[in-house]
Amino acid sequence: MSVRALARVNIAAIERNVRRLRRELASSVALCAVVKADGYGHGALPAARAALAGGARWLAVVAATEAATLRTGGIDAPILVMGALSPGELDVALAARADVVGWDESFVDAVAARGGGAIHVKLDTGMGRLGTRDPAVATRVAEAAAIADGVRLAGAMTHFATADDRDDPFLHEQLARFVAWLGPLRDTHPQIVAHAANSAATLRDPATHFDLVRTGVAIYGLDPFGEDPLARELEPALELRSYVGAVKAVAPGESVGYGRSFVARRPTYVATLPIGYGDGVRRALTNNADVLVRGVRRPLVGTVSMDNVTLDVGAPPQAAVGDGAILIGEQGDERITAEELALRLDTINYEITCGLLPRVPRAYHRDGEDLS
């Protein structure tokens, strides 16, 4: 390897994941690929292009600057900016020809004052973050958008809080609130695009699909329920790799790493990889993860430091300097997923890939064929 660590992203996998998700949808339902947070750590522009090639019709982000990046990169598809926007951010979003999300009449006025734009009105049905909880207020905002100069009432939306918990009935409570508000609104404004479903809801209940689904995590081959992606025919697109930089003998009683969190009980060898929490490998994985070397799981031992992790590779050593190491991905018959790491860290798979830091370059390929 010419770099310490590398995240390899299979563009073809993203395309196939989008096609797989489209199989869940009626032909009249559009798929919006969510590429916020630099495409969940995969790279926003390559992910956006792959998603569109796979059949997505829309893209969604949270920040206005993310929309501007997509436009600068040559993306011409409809873009929805889902986050709250300051006056300056609203300028950027509208300049990028992005649709924006609003929930009070002053926002409609702000869009109109800037020459207009397309607004999606958000009803908070239970997420408790953005949007108005009051359906009457949401309707007034929609009516204001429909008549304001230069403004187009483009959509009506909500967001589910517990779609990824299949045993939690709150999804259907939220759905009922959204439907009760949406029905009368559509009687007056039949052209609006209604949308509510994230990846989990898309896979869980077709009643949530409406006109458009906003799929994020699943297009990257990450399972929205935190389970094995392959069981849902999702294909993880990202592989995180490093290499063995050093191998040394460790005698019984000798320690490895800060704080002596690993003390050898038997003669062994430790391999050091030049990747650490400065690259996005969480320190909480100390003595709590495996890495693939020569197709075999090797336990991570010792404290994860900023620039290195260390593995017990046995005696005699089953690793040599230069061997490839896989932290996320496949090698031989073994596989380590973002879901596995998330389980070890008591978090979600999104955080694993979003947490890869800028020191890790991204490289793109199509089923093994490198892309320039």
Residue spans for each PLM region:
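Anionic-ligand-binding alpha/beta catalytic cores of soluble enzymes and soluble regulatory domains
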Residues: 167-269
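A structural signal for short, hydrophobic beta-strand segments that form beta-sheets
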Residues: 81, 153, 244, 300-301
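Active-site-proximal beta-alpha core segment in soluble small-molecule metabolic enzymes
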Residues: 5-8, 13-16, 27-196, 209
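Conserved beta-strand segments that form the floor/walls of ligand-binding pockets within enzyme
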Residues: 34, 120-122, 155, 214, ...
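Solvent-exposed alpha-helices and their adjacent loops that cap or buttress functional pockets
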Residues: 25, 72, 92-93, 114, ...
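Gly-rich Lys/Arg/Thr-decorated short loops/hinges at beta-loop-alpha junctions or inter-strand turns
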Residues: 1-3
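C-terminal accessory subdomain/extension
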Residues: 249-372
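Catalytic metal-binding/acid-base residues of hydrolase active sites
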Residues: 126, 161, 200, 218, ...
